[in-house]
């Protein structure tokens, strides 16, 4: 953890944006700034499950760095994932949608839309959340994806997400 304390720290809180997986009382919070159309984010997604299942004291927060004026694919996938989090009892689980996108339909929007169908009102209702995340990323000067923070500190570039267990 000492190496993390020497890294850049997030200036503002992220508690009310994005999607969180894991217990709310977790000792460690891993914040991942991502984009559904980022290849490196796709690769990183494979490690998220391993991390969540390996320790009960970790929660993972996903924040999308996607402008609402972005490409159709980025926006539609972000809306669907956020829409599932907004109404989990009615629709699909957010982790199910993330898994399907990154593991089975990456960059294939038509396949994704055949599998996950949401009312237009649910999808459009996510635009404020998408804008809020995008503006937060800009205010923190986070322009690249993925970016990973552990308890608010930037994970050094020379480490991979799977190595987080050794850092905490």
Located regions from the model:
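A short beta-strand-turn-helix
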Residues: 11-28, 53
């Amino acid at each position: 953890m000492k190496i993390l304390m020497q890294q850049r720290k997030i200036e503002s809180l992220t508690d009310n944006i994005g999607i969180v997986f894991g217990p709310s009382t977790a000792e460690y919070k891993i914040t991942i700034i991502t984009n559904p159309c980022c290849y490196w984010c796709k690769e990183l997604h494979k490690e998220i499950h391993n991390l969540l299942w390996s320790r009960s004291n970790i929660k993972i927060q996903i924040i999308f760095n996607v402008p609402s004026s972005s490409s159709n694919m980025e926006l539609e996938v972000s809306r669907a994932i956020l829409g599932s989090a907004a109404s989990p009892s009615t629709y699909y689980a957010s982790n199910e949608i993330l898994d399907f996108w990154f593991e089975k339909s990456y960059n294939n929007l038509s396949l994704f839309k055949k599998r996950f169908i949401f009312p237009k009102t649910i999808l459009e209702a996510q635009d404020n959340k998408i804008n809020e995340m995008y503006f937060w990323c800009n205010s923190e000067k986070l322009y690249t994806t993925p970016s990973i923070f552990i308890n608010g500190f930037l994970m050094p570039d020379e480490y991979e997400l799977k190595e987080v267990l050794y850092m905490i």
